[in-house]
C-alpha cells in the first residue's frame, strides 16, 4: 500500500477500517431529554476548567438512531452539564454510553465524544416513553415520560439541540505522557425538527462504579422533551489547549 493511501485511510485496520469517513447523516434521530437540577458541588467536580457551571443543571438524554450513514442502527445515552465558556452558554458532554462499536470508535477518534460501551434503550411502554441505560446486566438509569402529552414548540426544541457542546479530547504518547489534551467545541447546524412533545417525566439513577451517573443526583426535574429529527453533526474545533 502506498504511503499516501495509508494517510488517506480513515482508521485501522487499513483493509477494513473500524468506521468510514464522515460526515454522518442521521435520519429519524429520536431524543428523550430530561433536564434536572443537581448538587452544584458534585457538578463542579466533573466539569473541567476553563468551563464554568452556569447553573447546577444536567441533561440526561437517550437517543435512538435507526438510520445513520456509514454507522447503521444504534442507541446512545448520556449526561451533559449546562456550562459557559468565555460567556458563551452551552453544554459539556460528561459521558455517553453506546451500543455500537463503529459509533464509539468514530466518536472518540474523529471527534472528542466521551463514548464507552453500554446498553441504552428507547421505547414506548403502553402510554409511556421509556429511556433506560444498563451497564452489563446492571441498571444505571431509568427515565419515563408521558407519551406525546403536549406539543412542544419546534423552535424551542431546535434551540435546545443546537446549543454548543464542549468536550475533552485526551490522547497519550506511547510512554503514557499527555500528547493531546484539548477542550473542543461542536454544534449541530444542519437539523430538521420533525416533531416535538413534552409531558410529565421522572428520572431514577442507580449507583455504579463504572457508569457513575448517580454521582450527579436528581434533586428536581426541570423539563422534559421528546424530539424527532434529521440532522448532520458538525465538526469539532479546538477552543483551549491544556498543553500550550
UniProtKB/Swiss-Prot annotation:
GO terms for molecular function: acetoacetate decarboxylase activity. Its EC number is 4.1.1.4. Keywords: Decarboxylase, Lyase, Schiff base. The active site is at residue 115. Pfam families: ADC (PF06314). SUPFAM superfamilies: Acetoacetate decarboxylase-like. InterPro entries: Acetoacetate_decarboxylase, Acetoacetate_decarboxylase_bac, ADC_dom_sf. The keyword Membrane does not apply. It comes from the Bacteria. It catalyses: acetoacetate + H(+) = acetone + CO2. Catalyzes the conversion of acetoacetate to acetone and carbon dioxide. Belongs to the ADC family. This is Acetoacetate decarboxylase. The lineage of its organism: Bacteria, Bacillati, Actinomycetota, Actinomycetes, Kitasatosporales.
Amino acid at each position: 500500500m502506498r504511503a499516501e493511501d495509508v494517510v488517506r485511510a480513515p482508521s485501522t485496520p487499513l483493509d477494513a477500517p473500524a468506521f468510514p469517513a464522515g460526515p454522518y447523516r442521521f435520519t429519524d434521530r429520536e431524543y428523550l431529554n430530561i433536564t434536572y437540577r443537581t448538587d452544584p458541588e458534585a457538578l463542579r467536580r466533573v466539569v473541567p476548567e476553563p468551563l464554568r457551571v452556569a447553573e447546577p443543571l444536567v441533561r440526561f438524554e437517550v437517543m435512538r438512531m435507526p438510520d445513520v450513514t456509514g454507522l447503521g442502527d444504534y442507541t446512545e445515552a448520556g449526561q451533559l452539564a449546562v456550562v459557559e465558556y468565555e460567556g458563551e452558554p452551552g453544554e459539556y458532554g460528561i459521558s455517553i454510553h453506546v451500543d455500537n462499536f463503529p459509533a464509539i470508535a468514530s466518536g472518540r477518534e474523529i471527534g472528542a465524544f466521551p463514548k464507552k460501551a453500554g446498553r441504552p434503550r428507547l421505547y414506548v411502554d403502553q402510554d409511556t416513553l421509556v429511556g433506560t441505560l444498563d451497564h452489563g446486566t446492571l441498571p444505571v438509569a431509568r427515565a419515563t415520560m408521558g407519551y406525546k402529552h403536549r406539543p412542544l414548540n419546534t423552535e424551542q426544541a431546535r434551540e435546545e439541540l443546537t446549543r454548543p457542546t464542549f468536550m475533552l479530547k485526551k490522547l497519550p504518547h506511547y510512554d503514557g505522557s499527555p500528547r493531546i489534551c484539548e477542550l473542543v467545541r461542536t454544534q449541530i447546524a444542519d437539523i430538521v425538527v420533525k416533531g416535538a412533545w413534552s409531558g410529565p417525566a421522572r428520572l431514577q439513577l442507580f449507583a455504579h462504579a463504572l457508569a457513575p451517573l448517580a454521582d450527579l443526583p436528581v434533586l428536581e426535574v426541570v423539563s422534559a422533551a421528546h424530539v424527532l429529527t434529521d440532522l448532520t453533526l458538525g465538526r469539532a474545533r479546538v477552543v483551549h489547549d491544556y498543553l500550550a
